[in-house]
UniProtKB/Swiss-Prot annotation:
This is Kunitz-type serine protease inhibitor kunitoxin-Phi1. GO terms for cellular component: extracellular space. Transmembrane segments: none annotated. It comes from Philodryas olfersii. It comes from the Eukaryota. Serine protease inhibitor. Gene3D superfamilies: Pancreatic trypsin inhibitor Kunitz domain (4.10.410.10). Residues 39-89 form the BPTI/Kunitz inhibitor domain. Belongs to the venom Kunitz-type family.
Length: 98
């Protein structure tokens, strides 16, 4: 019985540490946001050789810009339509200073 209680306490402690490390309850600091992280990635053509016109969010210009995607792999900063890129990445949350 005590072993189960001890194990439960250890598991809850590990979960709390994991939650804090992932940005949850950061004491007023910005928390981790996967949408913003995706938009901060550089454009990634990937290893394939197709020439697919795609859009990526350029963190420096704060705009969605065109690039050629190879057709495989790449990353999440890769949108088929500029409207999708704008909707996901061009927002007040990203453009606000630190």
């Amino acid at each position: 019985m005590w072993a189960r209680v001890l194990l439960l306490g250890v598991l809850l402690s590990l979960l709390a540490d994991l939650h804090a490390a992932s940005g949850g309850d950061a004491g007023g600091q910005k928390t981790w946001n996967p949408r913003i992280s995706d938009c901060e990635l550089p454009p990634e053509k990937g290893p394939c050789n197709n020439l697919e016109l795609r859009w990526f969010y350029n963190l420096k210009s704060k705009r969605c810009e065109r690039f050629f995607y190879g057709g495989c792999y790449g990353n999440a900063n890769n949108f088929k339509e500029i409207n999708e890129c704008d909707r996901r990445c061009v927002s007040p949350d990203i453009n606000k200073p630190g």
